[in-house]
Amino acid sequence: MSAVPDDIAADFIIEAQEILDRLGEQLVSLEHAPEDSEQLNAVFRGFHTLKGGAGFLAINAMVELCHAAEDTLGQARAGQATLQARHFDAAQQSLDYLQSMLDAFGSGSEPPRAPQQLIAQFATSG
């Protein structure tokens, strides 16, 4: 873990946990109503915010996974892609990995990387 002041790390952990908790509910709602642009925007913002905080703290594993989700969601927001069942599956699995990464960061360990197969599931083609 990088030399980050304890209060900044603690604030990130609290905020990231709240975002992860919300994302779980928001993803279920979005999967049931994929045309709901408000819900799509909320899910995009959740991954975007996690990526930004993780980037600031150099949690590269978290940045990589959030970036993959954010790219796919961004394409869907722009009307350039349609979210498929595999995207929702990948997003739900990502929450588990992101939680593991957050737990590792909180305990001072190196966060585990997500499997490349999971990141590849976010691809909008194929």
Positions of PLM-derived features:
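Non-catalytic helical tethers at domain boundaries
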Residues: 1-126
